[in-house]
């Protein structure tokens, strides 16, 4: 009886063992391919890749910003055995201050990054040194290959790999590479995870020249800051968006005044002064209230309520036409045109010119003013706004509004991104998008469908602006063989704009010039704004800069002359 039970147990054990062996054979031999592939797939899920950030290009495909492969140095302080010796040696090789390195080595940390973008010599020396806790690794860093050129436009990559300011900030989600999970050896993974590439409308050569002209104004005219914008008035394409002073985005951490990061063309308000006069007069002409030949008698000053408005230098001009008002930049003449138009229509035109709304150019931090003081309905506010005081706008708003004279009465919306390739939005441009809801803000051309002034009015005012260059205060803008149209502007800067808690205006000035050419077949429109130059008026500061830049563009683009 006992033997039977023992045999039964042995049989059960043998059968159980045989079942296990059969199962192992099935899994390891018959189903080996299936489970191998399954394991391989599971491994693939746990191999992440941070995609490279997209590149930023100039119009000519010149790289403005890109992720560059590099070697970098880091230390693990807990693993460093002789901290004094290590600090000395690392300082000798890298050129970093020994005190800075020693401070990093004293931290209770597993990772302290010391230096990026190591040279081959530095990298090899560090590896040969082979110090405990000192490591050289491969990495990627964001580089701005054109240095400070267009720095406020491009912005920079800040902490936590987040885009700051400009294109880097506004299009951060598009530029940022995505994290993907890939199978080792899959070469397509890196391409698929890369962020979108952004192609700008900026022309590197003209941008470079414009920035040099601003630097020259800084050194020779004492200009504190300034901007130059060049735009195609037919499309709104921005060829130049230059700022002074600029900064080196590769070393942005060294900048002490954070205001330098701001793009003054879209982030700083100013009062335009006399460059507003053509818009005021155009509004009245468009409504049939006046014509270019309408005359009035200037007495040198004008009383409105308890206020008195004077001409520049208290000049008395006598009888003048509206064309002469622009030539001589007569304040009371602009007030006369506004009075003929009426305050309600005047405000309607200011709104149509886009002075109470942003342009949507697609740069981080664009601002605008609602001009609440102007909207209070006081007659004196309308009067001063007619010649550009008491109304606050940005340079980009100004060039957008002025484009109506060079574009048959229609307003060109400025844009600076031509197209986006790859990334979360593939191959996007405004020109091939099906509608407003499908496009990305600021990408590609878009002409306002709304006619702001009639083509006839636009042509009339353009001719008046040619007279300003030929016979007025902008003679220094003339270029032989070409008809150019433009207007000077000099406006007092409010105390509040220079950080003084005080009402009224200082003796400091904004000096500007806006012009286009050739006047009757425009290819470019240029806006120049200078903050507090040492010259008395824009005639001696902004106008010569316009001429030099316009001459460069005419030669560079090979624009044929109007006459021999």
Name every feature range the model reports, one short phrase each:
Residues 65, 228, 232-274, 279-425, ...:
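Beta-lactam-recognizing serine transpeptidase/beta-lactamase-like catalytic domain environment
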Residues 442, 544-564:
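Short, gly/Ser/Thr-rich active-site loops of penicillin-recognizing serine hydrolases
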């Amino acid at each position: 009886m006992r033997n039977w039970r023992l045999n039964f147990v042995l049989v059960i054990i043998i059968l159980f063992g045989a079942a296990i062996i059969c199962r192992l054979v099935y899994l390891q031999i018959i189903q080996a391919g299936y489970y191998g592939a399954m394991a391989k797939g599971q491994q693939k899920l746990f191999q992440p890749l941070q995609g490279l950030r997209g590149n930023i290009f100039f119009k000519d495909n010149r790289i403005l910003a890109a992720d560059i492969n590099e070697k970098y140095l880091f230390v693990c302080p807990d693993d460093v055995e002789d901290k004094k010796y290590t600090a000395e040696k690392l300082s000798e090789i890298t050129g970093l201050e020994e005190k800075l390195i020693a401070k990093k080595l004293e931290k209770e940390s597993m990772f302290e990054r010391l230096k990026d973008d190591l040279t081959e010599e530095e990298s090899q020396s560090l590896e040969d040194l082979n110090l405990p806790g000192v490591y050289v690794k491969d990495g990627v860093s964001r580089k701005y290959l054109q240095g400070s050129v267009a720095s406020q436009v491009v912005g920079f990559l800040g902490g936590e790999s987040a885009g700051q300011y400009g294109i880097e900030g506004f299009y951060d989600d598009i530029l940022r590479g995505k994290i993907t999970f890939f199978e080792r050896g899959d070469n397509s993974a890196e391409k698929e995870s890369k962020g979108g590439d952004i192609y700008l409308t900026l022309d590197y050569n003209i941008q470079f020249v414009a920035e040099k002209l601003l630097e020259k104004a800084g050194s020779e005219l004492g200009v504190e800051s300034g901007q130059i914008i060049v735009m195609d008035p037919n499309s709104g394409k921005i060829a130049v968006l230059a700022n002074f002073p600029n900064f080196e985005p590769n070393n942005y951490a060294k900048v002490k005044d954070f205001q330098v990061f701001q793009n003054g063309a879209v982030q700083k308000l100013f009062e335009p002064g006399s460059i507003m006069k053509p818009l005021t007069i155009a509004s009245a002409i468009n409504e049939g209230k006046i014509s270019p030949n309408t005359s009035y008698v200037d007495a040198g000053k004008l009383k409105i309520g308890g206020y008195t408005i004077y001409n520049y230098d208290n000049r008395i001009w006598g009888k003048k036409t509206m064309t002469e008002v622009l030539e001589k930049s007569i304040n009371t003449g602009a007030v006369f045109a506004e009075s003929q138009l009426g305050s309600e229509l005047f405000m309607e035109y200011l709104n149509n010119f886009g002075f109470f709304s942003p342009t949507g150019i697609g740069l981080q931090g664009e601002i605008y003013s609602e001009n609440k003081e102007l909207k209070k309905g006081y007659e004196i506010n309308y009067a001063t706004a007619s010649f550009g005081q008491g109304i606050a706008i940005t340079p980009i708003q100004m060039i957008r509004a002025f484009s109506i004279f060079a574009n048959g009465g229609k307003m060109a919306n400025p844009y600076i991104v031509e197209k986006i390739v790859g990334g979360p939005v593939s191959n996007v441009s405004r020109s091939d998008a099906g509608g407003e809801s499908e496009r990305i803000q600021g990408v590609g051309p878009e002409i306002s469908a709304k006619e702001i002034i009639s083509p006839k009015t636009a042509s009339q005012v353009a001719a008046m602006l040619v007279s300003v260059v030929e016979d007025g205060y902008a003679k220094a803008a003339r270029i032989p063989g070409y008809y150019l149209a433009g207007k000077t502007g000099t406006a007092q800067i409010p105390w509040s704009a220079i950080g003084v808690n005080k009402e009224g205006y200082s003796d400091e000035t904004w000096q500007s010039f806006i012009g286009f050419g050739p006047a009757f077949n425009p290819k470019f429109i240029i806006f120049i704004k200078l903050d507090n130059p040492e010259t008395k008026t824009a005639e001696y500061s902004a106008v010569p800069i316009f001429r030099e830049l316009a001459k460069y563009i005419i030669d560079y683009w090979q624009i044929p002359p109007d006459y021999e």
